[in-house]
Regions:
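Bacterial carbohydrate/catabolite-sensing allosteric modules
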Residues: 1-237, 241-250, 254-260, 264-272, ...
Length: 300
């Protein structure tokens, strides 16, 4: 048996595996931030009862022990994500970088920064450890670390083939696949080729998430938006941009050379995917949860 697509730290030593490791992913992102000159790193948006977040938190604490010139601190929440954001805000002057466990938390934090007048990346660098569509289309776009599931699949086959050839039932082989840092605007990189993401399956092994992560209203809204974006093509993204710009449906049809029925079909699909029932509800979702400016419909 070769276990895959589960955090290596969760897999019993009796099993062979080819998969990702949250500990290694955390260390990779910390390496990237330290190389950029970051010295005071806050890990924000950690659920107190999330085993995944505990792994990230412990990985940072242990890794930064090797770098006496760098400091790290963690900000948790018990019921609502803004508990963590507010705790960080009270101590914000002590940090130059914020690292979030995933793109949902990071986009929510960018929205929080806008409300508090914090300009990213001028005042603060922000990055996250899971890449999602919402992180590419917010503004500033999010520097993130993507798991290469194609590489995991390839290595799983290689491990299986090796075990078949080895023929020893007691032999075990474990491979942890590194992620890939995608630098974007939130750490000072201009949007360009780096905006492309490796294929991601959403929330990875979400069954390990504890606490209120999946019930927090703001994070739920962002997950609905993520599902919407995963179903969008380039034309849909341009429609979203024009909707946010306040264009009337007739003007959208004219600009995009769409017939009324085609536009109606696409708009309904967008609203349904975002779990909204009307244009007003969709706009409200965007205004209340996403960044004020976006990259929807822009050339990458």
């Amino acid at each position: 048996i070769v276990v895959t697509n589960v955090d290596a730290d969760h897999i019993d030593a009796h099993y062979s595996c080819a998969t990702f490791s949250r500990r290694i992913i955390t260390e990779q992102m910390l390496d990237h931030l330290l190389d950029k000159g970051c010295r005071r790193i806050a890990m924000v948006g950690l659920g107190q009862r999330s085993f995944n977040d505990m792994v990230h938190q412990d990985a940072m604490a242990q890794y930064l022990l090797k770098y006496p010139y760098a400091e790290g601190a963690c900000f948790e929440y018990q019921n609502r994500i803004d508990e963590s954001f507010n705790a960080f805000y009270a101590m914000r002057d002590g940090f130059d970088t914020v690292l979030c466990p995933n793109a949902f938390v990071a986009v929510a934090f960018l929205h929080f920064c806008e409300e508090k007048g914090i300009v990213v990346p001028n005042d603060l660098l922000v990055a996250c450890m899971k890449d999602h569509s919402i992180g590419r289309y917010c503004k500033p776009s999010l520097t993130s670390l993507a798991v290469d599931f194609f590489a995991i699949g390839e290595q799983s086959v290689i491990v299986w083939q090796y075990l078949q050839e080895e023929g020893n039932e007691r032999f075990r082989m474990r491979i942890a696949i590194q992620g890939h840092v995608i630098e974007r605007e939130s750490t000072g990189s201009a949007l360009g080729g780096g905006a492309q993401s490796l294929v991601n399956d959403g929330t990875l092994d979400g069954e390990y998430e504890g606490g209120p992560f999946y019930t927090d209203p703001e994070l739920q809204a962002l997950m609905s938006l993520e599902r919407c974006l995963q179903n969008c093509d380039e034309l849909d993204l341009r429609i979203i941009r024009l909707l946010l710009d306040g264009e009337h449906y007739d003007a959208i049809s004219e600009q995009l050379y769409l017939g009324d029925s085609s536009l109606q079909y696409r708009v309904r699909k967008i609203f349904h995917s975002a779990q909204t029932k009307s244009r007003d509800e969709f706009i409200r979702l965007m205004r209340n949860s996403f960044t004020r400016n976006t990259h929807f419909g822009e050339e990458e």
